Design a protein with these regions (language model features):
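FMN-binding flavodoxin-like domain, especially the glycine-rich phosphate-binding loop
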Residues: 2-12, 16-40, 46-143
């Protein structure tokens, strides 16, 4: 299956999110899937309609905020037909209100019509790899 891993931080280049996306991609690819990772800040306007599964990784705007970067909303609105796509969403652990941030990200993705399967908080690269390896992209579940 073709899997798209999207990540977005506040600035254009955040090494922590890039590491999480890379490790998650490696974990998913170890199951034999074709995986591509993109930075939403740099690839604005990219069409992701032809991917079978979409993964979104982001972080909170600030330490005590529940909001995610505005570019996530803009990207999903201009990404082509994402309604009905099976997807997963993850956030990094560098927020004081992790559950609110994750809940808001789920709300944004579901408002675009995406079918959310798995959501979680990624603490480090090793955990991201383990989650990617155990993520059943075909069924959308996690072991």
């Amino acid at each position: 299956m073709r899997v798209c891993v999207l990540y977005c931080g506040n600035q254009g280049n955040e090494p922590k999110l890039k590491e999480l996306a890379t490790k998650l991609s490696d974990g998913i690819a170890s199951n034999g899937h074709t995986v591509e990772a993109f930075d939403m800040n740099l690839e604005m306007g990219k069409v992701i309609s032809f991917y079978d599964y979409v993964v979104v990784i982001t972080r909170a705007v600030s330490l005590f905020s529940k909001y995610i970067p505005e570019n996530v909303l803009k990207f999903l609105k201009t990404a082509g037909t994402v309604s009905g796509k099976r997807c997963s969403c993850f956030i990094s652990k560098d927020s004081a209100r992790k559950s609110k941030v994750l809940q808001y990200l789920m709300h944004v993705m579901e408002s675009e019509g995406m079918y959310l399967m798995v959501s979680d908080v990624l603490s480090n690269g090793d955990y991201a790899y383990a989650v990617g390896k155990r993520l059943h992209v075909d069924s959308g579940m996690k072991e």
